[in-house]
Amino acid sequence: MAQGNLYILSAPSGAGKSSLISALLNQQQDNKMMVSVSHTTRQPRPGEQEGVHYYFVSVEAFESLIEQDLFLEYAKVFGGNYYGTSLPAIEENLAKGIDVFLDIDWQGAQQIRQKVPNVKSIFILPPSLAELERRLIGRGQDSTEVIAARMSKAIDEISHYNEYDYVIVNDVFEQALADFQAILRAERLTLTHQQKQNQALIEQLLAK
């Protein structure tokens, strides 16, 4: 069985990353794609489910996992809560041939590249800053001050786009989704992947 591929997905808030991932997963037919579920020390919010949105653990349990080097990446964010990506869980799913998506920012991406040099990374850009702001306002979730802060952070995040293997401009959603699917398809057709996926066939074709 061929190993699954590990993907980093990054984008400024409002670029449509979550919508693209959701649409991709809803269209899959072989259950060979999934989004990694992170560990966190924050309290669950209404509607969040253990193992679906996050794995909710204590600070002591999280720091024990850090000491055992069981996180692919982790960070302590504003407010003092930890967030991290479990290395054993990632390895288990990749071994099953499942493509795993890591929804993280550029800083987490840098950590992961140090541990997994062959990870593939995708950055999603908005068609313009004006459109990005329009989308954030259209959500109706944030105050004017929060939107301004998100826009300021977005410019910093976008400045790291050139650290990624692939870039998708999410202007027309259907085209962006098709571009996303094309990347995943191409990665499954690489020599390394096909040698493992079709090992028996290749051996048969080369048999004398």
UniProtKB/Swiss-Prot annotation:
Record-linked PROSITE patterns: GUANYLATE_KINASE_1, GUANYLATE_KINASE_2
One function term, GO molecular function aspect: guanylate kinase activity
EC number, UniProt record: 2.7.4.8
GO terms for cellular component: cytosol
Domain Guanylate kinase-like: 4-185
Binding positions for ATP per the UniProt entry: A11, P12, S13, G14, A15, G16, K17, S18
Catalytic class of the enzyme: transferase
Keywords from the named record: ATP-binding, Cytoplasm, Kinase, Nucleotide-binding, Transferase
Catalytic activity from the UniProt record: GMP + ATP = GDP + ADP
CDD domains: GMPK (cd00071)
Highest taxon in the source lineage: Bacteria
SMART domains: GuKc
Subcellular location: Cytoplasm
PANTHER family membership: GUANYLATE KINASE (PTHR23117:SF13), GUANYLATE KINASE-RELATED (PTHR23117)
Family the UniProt entry places it in: Belongs to the guanylate kinase family.
Biological role: Essential for recycling GMP and indirectly, cGMP.
HAMAP family referenced in this protein's UniProt entry, alphabetically: Guanylate_kinase
Name this protein carries in UniProt: Guanylate kinase
Organism: Pasteurella multocida (strain Pm70)
Higher taxonomy: Bacteria, Pseudomonadati, Pseudomonadota, Gammaproteobacteria, Pasteurellales
